[in-house]
Amino acid sequence: MGLYARHLAPWLVDCACGTKPIAYQRRKIIPRASGVVLEIGAGGGRNFALYDRGKVERVIALEPDAAMVNRGRARAPEGLPLEWLQRGAENAGVTDRSVDTIVTTYTLCTIPDAVGALAALRRALKPDGRLLFCEHGLAPDTEVTRWQRRIEPVWRPMAGGCHLTRDVEAMIAAAGWRIDEAERMYLPGTPRFAGYNVWGSARPG
């Protein structure tokens, strides 16, 4: 792994995931989490301060990248019960039926087999558990999609493996989840090729 991948890429990704429009999106989802929370790709810990301490028992932070784990540890607020698992979502190793809420924000774009990971993670949920998601992905407009496909081959290695052309809702459904609610929009102040957002909740189908 080169210097860029070890140090510069995590810093760039963390900065990109900390813009005001993205922070606003996070606030729509994270306070809804409750019980034992499994956060996929916890990264630099941008969500930690947004959890409702009165509703959350503890957060299991899943993150394979050591540099991002270090950033997340530094950003963790005092008093939040936090457990780190330095591994990928495809091989989370979380006990079956032990989690109330699974959270994924701006993470599915980088998981090599996102559908497989989402399918495997269904086992971790308690019977009444749910998935909360807020992701960017494939735009519905032909011209934007065309640019996404052009830019993606250059974008991916620069942005930590981030895909621009993944259909968020289709991936979630293909992994065996039933989407209960979903909202969609282009983020203001964000290039349209990277700014199409989908957020909502889902349960195992």
Locate each region found by the language model.
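A short glycine-rich, Lys/Arg-flanked "PGG" loop and its adjoining helix->strand segment in the class I
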Residues: 115-127
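A short SAM/SAH-binding and catalytic strip from SAM-dependent methyltransferases
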Residues: 100-114
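Short alpha-helix
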Residues: 160-176
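Class I SAM-dependent methyltransferase SAM/SAH-binding core
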Residues: 38-40, 44-92
